[in-house]
Amino acid sequence: MKIEAVIFDMDGVIINSEPFWVEAELEVYGKYGLKMTEEMCNQMKGTRIEDVVNHWHSLFQWTEPSQKVIINEILEKVIYNIKERGKAMPGLLGLLEYLQDSKIKIGLATSSLYCIVDAVMDKLQIAGYFTGINSAESEKLGKPAPDVYLGAAKKIGVNPRKCLAVEDSYTGLLSAKAAGMFTIAMPEKSEYNLEKYNIAHLKIKSLKEIIELDYQGKLNLVNNIPVEK
C-alpha cells in the first residue's frame, strides 16, 4: 500500500522544544513548592499539558494555585523559549521539500495546544507545507488514544492506514499505532536503545534518515513497499 501522507508529531520531532517543557514545568512547579524532577517530567512526554498537570495534582493534591494557573504559566514559558531558542530539528526542511515534491501530503498531530503550534509555525516559517494540523486541544482524548492522529488524517483527507507517523515519544507511538498508521520512532539520544521504542515499524536518529530509507526501499513514499511488522 502506497503511503499518501506523513504526519509528524511536533515537540522533539520538528522542533527542539522537548527540553523547554521540562524547564518550564520544573520552574513553575518549584515556584509553588512542588518537588519535581526531570525524570518525572519525562515520564509524561507526549501527553497534553492539561492531562500532565491533572496527573500531578492527583498525586500531590495542592490547593493553590489552580491547575489552570499552572498550565498558563507553563505555556507562557514554553512559548517564550520557542521564540528565543527554538530550532528546526536536523533534516526537517529538506524532508518537507522532498515530501512536497513527491506530492505526499503533510500533517501534524500534536499534544500541544494551538497557541504552541502557532509559535512553532511562526518561528520555523513552515506552515505552508502542512495540509492539515490537529491538536489534542480539539479532541476528547489525548495521546495515547488514537484521536489526535485520526483527526489529523481526516483533516488531510487520507485513510489512516495510508499514513506514516513520525514520533519521538512512546505515548505518541501508541497513539499512532492505535490509529493504524505505519510508524517511525525518533527517540532522543539518551532513550534510543530503550526496548519500548521497538513497537515502531522503524527507528531513526534523525529526520535526515527518512529520505535515505525511502531510497533503500524501506518506505513507500514514492515507489517502494514498506516493511511489514
Model feature map: region roles:
Residues 1-4, 97-100, 113-229:
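Asp-based, Mg2+/Mn2+-dependent phosphohydrolase catalytic module
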Residues 1-42:
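Active-site neighborhood of HAD-like aspartate-dependent phosphohydrolases
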Residues 22, 26, 46-54, 71, ...:
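An amphipathic alpha-helix signature
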Residues 28-29, 48-63, 120, 152-153:
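Helix-loop "lid/cap" segments that line or gate small-molecule binding pockets
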Residues 35, 57-94:
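Metal-dependent phosphoesterase signature
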Residues 80-108, 114, 118:
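Short, acidic loop-to-helix structural element flanking the phosphoryl-transfer center
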